[in-house]
Amino acid sequence: MAERDLAVAILAAGKGTRMRSQLPKVLHKLGSLSLIERLLRTVLTLKPQRCLVIVGYEQEQVRRALQEYPVEFVEQAQQLGTGHAVQQLLPVLENFQGDLLVVNGDVPLLRAETLQALLERHRQVQPDVTLLSAQVADPYGYGRVFCDAQQRILELVEERDCTPAQRQNRRINSGVYCFHWPALARVLPRLGRNNAQQEYYLTEAVKLLDTAIALDAEDAREIVGINDRRQLAQAYQILQDRLKEAWMEAGVTFVDPDSVSLEETVELAPDVVIEPQTHLRGVCRIGPRTRLGPGSWIESSTIGSDCHILYSVVSHSQIGDRVWVGPYAHVRPHSQIGDGCRIGNFVEIKNAQIGSHTNAAHLAYLGDAKLGSQVNIGAGTIIANYDGQQKHFTEIGDRSKTGANSVLVAPLKIGSDVTIAAGSTIPARYPVPDDCLVIARAYPVVKPGWRPGSAAAGRPQPLPTGSLRVYPLRLLPGQDLKQELERFARQQPLQAGFVLSAVGSLSQATLRLADQTEDYLLSERLEILALSGSLCPDGVHLHLAVADAQGRTWGGHLRPGCLIYTTAEIVLADSLEYRFSRQPDPATGYLELHIEKVAEATPPSPQRADGTGVGIPSCPP
């Protein structure tokens, strides 16, 4: 068998009118690769000395798409047929003495084994041309090949030029030829355009050559050309069938092959089971006995052995052995999940490292995080990783647990053996040491008669404790102590209010003593020592004690004109068992406190953080 140099010419100048697209036909995708890329990767396995791509329509797009491949581009400015395309090679291959393999750019399913067989047959027999043909059930749309018993070509007829009798021939021309270039170069200038399309046919060159033979492809499916979207879809199905048949022979189960798709870059171990409606894209490696689907999307990810990915999306991530994912989980890019983990329904993981035997069984978001081993994530746990400007990182130690509906505000580091109580919000940068319980809750608030925009909206709200409602307040510099307390008592309204504690400072104080008609003013900075009395919507009756810089104390009825210097931190309480009002008292002549017993209240009775009794639960500062 004579060894000669090999050049390859790929015809890629046509528009592909029937594709109804602005994209050149050869750049349409078949799976992850364009038609011409698939073909080019196949022909390059033959190791040709030169690989020539003939371009025309939207040639800049084709040049850009193939810029990483070792090819030469030859322009066909006018698209006047396949023969005209090959004529453009005459100056390019002027001194070439080897063989030329000519392939249409829209035949992406050709296998390297078939082209190698064509090349070997051509070099063994040494005709001027060897044509790749095939026997098909439906030859419509293809040119026909007529041969004698020795496979010498007698006639080639294009579909549009066939007589009714010739159309009955089921042997078709694939458009793949192996020419001896010196012989082809002699006849190319003699091509004519005497046909229905007024084009230069390459088949005309075959007729002009002295010796021409045909070789049938073993699998007619691989010479399918792509002229429209229907044929593109059919070619995709052929590609999928080819891939799945190979994997089934290697020990992989496809429960419903027709509903599954995958790419050539996928690697499947023996005893993998692919359930219906599952799709694999990119570079994927799936370990033994793993079950994918039903209804899963796996992209560019590595999944270990004995896993189950159920109705879920896994993208650009790594999953260990014996991991359960789903249903309806989303493992986003740059995530690593350790052995024995469970990522359950409606759990989203992004850029996270999950230690072994960690569970997030349902309804959680774990983003930009590192979780240790044997961590348990309660339902509704959210890592709040974005502050509106940048993402922050969260770390959770081994064996820690989060209760239901917890929010972890990043950046945050939680130690090992930590329990986060249900409903807790852990603020950013809050130190959480090893081996502790953390409770950080907001307690229920009831606003009777509240509606959006009503007077009740926006008021400070109480923390329930026994039969009391507790209101912590802070007054700001310049505010009037009495006026602010009167306003607060009216707006709540306080039912039977009184002062629990008060600390702070005043820039001045106005007080009045009993039986006095005039106030006295202290115009200096003063510390609040005590504030006591009652509050209700009708008014307040409060006494104030203050001290000056020399330690002298002053006291009396609180009057308007007590102005806050730096702050006043006041805790008020409101009894749910009584109702206060201020009514005229004939004996004193003043508005005095009137006390009324109301129906016994039964508010919630929260326990202390240690669970030993009733009181205000302890929370982190």
Swiss-Prot record:
<dbReference type="InterPro" id="IPR038009">
    <property type="entry name" value="GlmU_C_LbH"/>
</dbReference>
<keyword id="KW-0808">Transferase</keyword>
<feature type="binding site">
    <location>
        <position position="350"/>
    </location>
    <ligand>
        <name>UDP-N-acetyl-alpha-D-glucosamine</name>
    </ligand>
</feature>
<keyword id="KW-0573">Peptidoglycan synthesis</keyword>
<feature type="binding site">
    <location>
        <position position="441"/>
    </location>
    <ligand>
        <name>acetyl-CoA</name>
    </ligand>
</feature>
<keyword id="KW-0511">Multifunctional enzyme</keyword>
<dbReference type="InterPro" id="IPR011004">
    <property type="entry name" value="Trimer_LpxA-like_sf"/>
</dbReference>
<dbReference type="GO" id="GO:0006048">
    <property type="term" value="P:UDP-N-acetylglucosamine biosynthetic process"/>
</dbReference>
<comment type="similarity">
    <text>In the N-terminal section; belongs to the N-acetylglucosamine-1-phosphate uridyltransferase family.</text>
</comment>
<feature type="binding site">
    <location>
        <position position="143"/>
    </location>
    <ligand>
        <name>UDP-N-acetyl-alpha-D-glucosamine</name>
    </ligand>
</feature>
<keyword id="KW-0677">Repeat</keyword>
<feature type="binding site">
    <location>
        <position position="76"/>
    </location>
    <ligand>
        <name>UDP-N-acetyl-alpha-D-glucosamine</name>
    </ligand>
</feature>
<dbReference type="InterPro" id="IPR005882">
    <property type="entry name" value="Bifunctional_GlmU"/>
</dbReference>
<comment type="similarity">
    <text>In the C-terminal section; belongs to the transferase hexapeptide repeat family.</text>
</comment>
<feature type="binding site">
    <location>
        <begin position="81"/>
        <end position="82"/>
    </location>
    <ligand>
        <name>UDP-N-acetyl-alpha-D-glucosamine</name>
    </ligand>
</feature>
<keyword id="KW-0460">Magnesium</keyword>
<dbReference type="GO" id="GO:0071555">
    <property type="term" value="P:cell wall organization"/>
</dbReference>
<comment type="pathway">
    <text>Nucleotide-sugar biosynthesis; UDP-N-acetyl-alpha-D-glucosamine biosynthesis; N-acetyl-alpha-D-glucosamine 1-phosphate from alpha-D-glucosamine 6-phosphate (route II): step 2/2.</text>
</comment>
<feature type="binding site">
    <location>
        <position position="173"/>
    </location>
    <ligand>
        <name>UDP-N-acetyl-alpha-D-glucosamine</name>
    </ligand>
</feature>
<comment type="subunit">
    <text>Homotrimer.</text>
</comment>
<feature type="binding site">
    <location>
        <position position="332"/>
    </location>
    <ligand>
        <name>UDP-N-acetyl-alpha-D-glucosamine</name>
    </ligand>
</feature>
<dbReference type="InterPro" id="IPR025877">
    <property type="entry name" value="MobA-like_NTP_Trfase"/>
</dbReference>
<dbReference type="GO" id="GO:0016020">
    <property type="term" value="C:membrane"/>
</dbReference>
<dbReference type="GO" id="GO:0005737">
    <property type="term" value="C:cytoplasm"/>
</dbReference>
<keyword id="KW-0133">Cell shape</keyword>
<feature type="binding site">
    <location>
        <begin position="11"/>
        <end position="14"/>
    </location>
    <ligand>
        <name>UDP-N-acetyl-alpha-D-glucosamine</name>
    </ligand>
</feature>
<dbReference type="Pfam" id="PF03479">
    <property type="entry name" value="PCC"/>
</dbReference>
<feature type="binding site">
    <location>
        <position position="227"/>
    </location>
    <ligand>
        <name>UDP-N-acetyl-alpha-D-glucosamine</name>
    </ligand>
</feature>
<dbReference type="GO" id="GO:0009252">
    <property type="term" value="P:peptidoglycan biosynthetic process"/>
</dbReference>
<feature type="active site" description="Proton acceptor">
    <location>
        <position position="362"/>
    </location>
</feature>
<feature type="region of interest" description="Pyrophosphorylase">
    <location>
        <begin position="1"/>
        <end position="229"/>
    </location>
</feature>
<feature type="binding site">
    <location>
        <position position="365"/>
    </location>
    <ligand>
        <name>UDP-N-acetyl-alpha-D-glucosamine</name>
    </ligand>
</feature>
<dbReference type="GO" id="GO:0009245">
    <property type="term" value="P:lipid A biosynthetic process"/>
</dbReference>
<feature type="region of interest" description="Disordered">
    <location>
        <begin position="601"/>
        <end position="621"/>
    </location>
</feature>
<keyword id="KW-0963">Cytoplasm</keyword>
<feature type="binding site">
    <location>
        <position position="376"/>
    </location>
    <ligand>
        <name>UDP-N-acetyl-alpha-D-glucosamine</name>
    </ligand>
</feature>
<dbReference type="GO" id="GO:0043886">
    <property type="term" value="F:structural constituent of carboxysome shell"/>
</dbReference>
<feature type="binding site">
    <location>
        <position position="422"/>
    </location>
    <ligand>
        <name>acetyl-CoA</name>
    </ligand>
</feature>
<dbReference type="GO" id="GO:0000287">
    <property type="term" value="F:magnesium ion binding"/>
</dbReference>
<keyword id="KW-0479">Metal-binding</keyword>
<dbReference type="Pfam" id="PF12804">
    <property type="entry name" value="NTP_transf_3"/>
</dbReference>
<dbReference type="GO" id="GO:0000902">
    <property type="term" value="P:cell morphogenesis"/>
</dbReference>
